[in-house]
Amino acid sequence: MKDEICIFCKLANGDIPTATVYEDEYLRAIMDAAPANKGHIIILPKSHAANIYELEDEYVSRAFVLAKKLAVALKKLTGCDDVNILQNNGGAAGQTVFHFHVHVIPRFKDDDCTIVWKPTSYEDGEASEVAKKIAELL
């Protein structure tokens, strides 16, 4: 269902004009208005969900299948070296618009776009223990 005050719902459902790359009954992919690099695309579900936790699995699957197709198209069109496919869930993860969306960003070896974190490490056996606990929750 569409949220009447959500800007991304309005973009996804055509209430605000956009440069649309792709559209079907579930999704709209548009050019990002403030791109990290030229060719930066945002995939938006037409149904409102704040994050991946709320989004129906079919929408998640369709969004990431489309992300792959867009990545291939961007490499052909832009000649980019690689592509980032990004999706943030919640403020602590960097989400700023609370409507699920996927960024598809063409990357070039010498561009100014950075995605950085400070690596940490596990104690001996800790990774296996965490993996087991996650698997139990699936």
Residue ranges and their predicted role:
Residues 1-138:
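HIT superfamily nucleotide-processing domains
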